[in-house]
Amino acid sequence: MKSAALLLPLYAAAFAAAAFHHEHAQAVIQEQQLTIVEPDEYLIELSPGETRWVTENEKWELRKKNINFFDITHNAELGTLKRRINAASVEYPSKPVFNETLAPLLKELDKNNMRAHLETFTSFHTRYYKSQYGVQSSAWLLDQVKKTLADAGASKASVKAFPHPWGQSSIIATIPGKSDKTIVIGAHQDSINLFFPAFLAAPGADDDGSGTVTILEALRVLLKSDEILKGEADNTIEFHWYSAEEGGLLGSQAIFQSYEKEARDVKAMLQQDMTGYVQKTLDAGEPESVGVITDFVDPGLTEFIKKIITVYCDIPYVLTKCGYACSDHASASKAGYPSAFVIESDFKYSDNKIHTTEDKIEYLSFDHMLQHARMTLALAYELAFAEFK
């Protein structure tokens, strides 16, 4: 996800360890890195129309300074094609209406499932998108999604890897409805250690292991609905796990560029990036809440999500901002699709251990992640049966 303030002592310790174990570090580099032909410089977009050529090291330095961007080196066409559907024309329900139907489903959400998945997901040395570990973690995640569909008997549903030239694939699970109008639920699967991405550990428990397992659990329970399972929902639902978010929203850009070219009719996209950290909120004396992002998002979809949280979650929301290109919903927006983003807290209280070796499970609240899962499940179900024009 976006860069949080990284702690200098963590860098110093990492540098000392790297220097002391130089030979071991070289071995890790050789094991992790894939053979990938990379350009000398990358074209990044820091705000609409503001572009710059930078080296890879300069990309990471920008991230350390909390500066986000699209890497548009290979995705310059995203957002340039005319689409048949105007995102501004999408109208969302005036209020949630499936309270009674969702009540028993919400009870099926299990934080123990999220913990078990996250324990394995964070056991990979890193999920850096250009590493062999990143390839392995993506393959493991694909297997978990396949198992989720198989266990549910979801014969109409499917899942596929969306390959990328850097090695780590994105993943797309599709639950067909009665129309091609599509609701997308997303999270990113990669992690990064911004000090030495190629070889330092990046457990990525919160960023974005938490979002990854949150939407996986929402998918599992959504498939307990007979109507969803039988393809009787009005709209198609997709769950996306993006590769290479940390490199400049690369995986989501590739997917939404392909959707734009195919004139795919995406009615809504919700990103879940960092769903588990609450300690800074509590330390500040503030009530536990979820953070609804209000900048660079679709206002209509965001307003409906606020209603979803009010009805289906046990904690309130706060309104907050995260800036341009701060997570994968920005790729959907750039393609002309209405998107939204809900994070774990007010942005100023979000996890500052991300992108380091300290982004660990022990700092997360699975009760809080359960609230994100409730919101995700409820939104997916409500919009699956929404009547869009």
Curated annotation (Swiss-Prot):
It is found in: Secreted. GO terms for biological process: proteolysis. It is an enzyme of class 3 (hydrolase). It comes from Pyrenophora teres f. teres (strain 0-1) (Barley net blotch fungus). Glycans are attached at N99. Extracellular aminopeptidase that allows assimilation of proteinaceous substrates. Belongs to the peptidase M28 family. M28E subfamily. One of its GO terms (cellular component) is extracellular region. Its main location: secreted. Zn(2+) 2 binds at D207, E246, H355. Keywords: Aminopeptidase, Disulfide bond, Glycoprotein, Hydrolase, Metal-binding, Protease, Secreted, Signal, Zinc, Zymogen. The keyword Secreted applies. Gene3D superfamilies: Zn peptidases (3.40.630.10). Residues 19-89 form a propeptide. Monomer. Coiled coil: none annotated. This is Leucine aminopeptidase 1. Its cofactor is Zn(2+). Disulfide bonds join C322-C326. Pfam families: Peptidase_M28 (PF04389).
